[in-house]
Amino acid sequence: MAGGCCGIFQRWLSIFLYAIGIGLSSFAYYIELKKEADENYVALCDMDEFISCSSVFNSTYGKGFGLVALVTGDEKHPLNQPNALYGIIFYSLLGLFYLCSGTSRFMANLQFFSFVLANIMSCYLAYILYFILKTLCVVCVSTYAVNLLLLMLSYCKRRSLRKRTPSVMETFQRGPTLPGSFDFKKNI
């Protein structure tokens, strides 16, 4: 495959990171459900009052990114779901898109811009984590790292596909070629 940062290693690393993203989001969702059911539940990632993931997951910012209830004015709005549930859906869909995309430039662009958005949201949530909640969530920081790595890998894939395949406009400008015809510009 073309490109120094792309190839079989990139494919397996991407699949591994999608699985890690699904696993971290599922773990966060599990902790949130357990904490809602039992206030005395202590999660594995709750080490002290400063390092506590369950306090973050059960805060107002742990559902709907802290934005849905603010915008709709309704805590029980159907979109005001745990952030972890959004993470499970996000990583599952993009992982599926990744497995099915092959050499599609459209899918590579979709993945890249999805991870640009995910990293913007990661910065927003990291700000809330550090400056507003004043705590550290190991699971949250791990998902931020997964998002950053997947952004880098999607950029590599997008760049390698841009080098290998012509755009629609380039193909259109070149014009149709008949079977068996010889293109002097291309073959010399």
PLM feature spans:
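Membrane-interfacial helix-loop segments of redox and metal-homeostasis proteins
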Residues: 1-188
